[in-house]
């Protein structure tokens, strides 16, 4: 598939997604060994967990924060390819699709030491989400 056609599909998917996600943010109930984060948008409220993944780096536990945003259903192989290609272009962002015809998710992963989970970390997540949204808006 040509890059031009690929970008056309990606733009269509992104525009649909942006219309649905008028507002979203990341916040935590309580920082700690395990905390819950939420993503809110116009259609959907999802819960995700922040879990110690048992990796120890320099004597410190690590965490992975994943932010998932609901995407329109993937209708074809071309849709899926467009989404995966977008993921390659966005640093730190992964697009996950189980199979064609099944909803995908846009995920942002931030890794760092658990004891540094703070408002600054959540603010950084919000900045990355804003960058991703701006990228889609520019397509």
Label for each model-derived stretch:
Residues 1-51, 55, 74, 89-101:
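Charge-rich, low-complexity N-terminal segments
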Residues 92-124, 131, 137-138:
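Well-ordered alpha/beta subsegment
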Residues 17-20, 83-90, 125-139:
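Conserved short hydrophobic interaction patches
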Residues 60-105:
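Short, internal acidic amphipathic alpha-helical interface segments
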Residues 50-68, 120-132:
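A signal for specific C-terminal beta-sheet/loop modules enriched in small/flexible residues
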Residues 35-37, 49, 64-66, 107-109:
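Ordered hydrophobic segments in well-structured contexts
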Residues 5-13, 75-79, 121-131:
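Short amphipathic alpha-helical segments
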Residues 40, 67-71, 110-114:
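Short beta-strand-to-loop capping motifs
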């Amino acid at each position: 598939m040509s890059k031009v056609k690929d970008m056309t599909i990606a733009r269509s998917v992104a525009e649909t997604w942006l219309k649905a996600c008028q507002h979203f943010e990341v916040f935590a109930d309580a920082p700690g060994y395990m905390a819950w984060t939420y993503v809110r948008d116009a259609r959907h409220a999802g819960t995700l967990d922040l879990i110690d993944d048992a990796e120890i780096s320099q004597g410190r536990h690590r965490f992975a924060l994943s932010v998932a945003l609901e995407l329109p259903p993937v209708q074809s192989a071309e849709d899926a390819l467009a989404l995966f290609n977008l993921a390659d272009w966005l640093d730190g962002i992964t697009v996950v699709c189980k199979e064609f015809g099944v909803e995908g998710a846009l995920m942002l992963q931030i890794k760092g030491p658990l004891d540094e989970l703070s408002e600054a970390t959540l603010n950084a997540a919000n900045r990355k989400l804003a960058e991703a949204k701006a990228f889609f808006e520019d397509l």
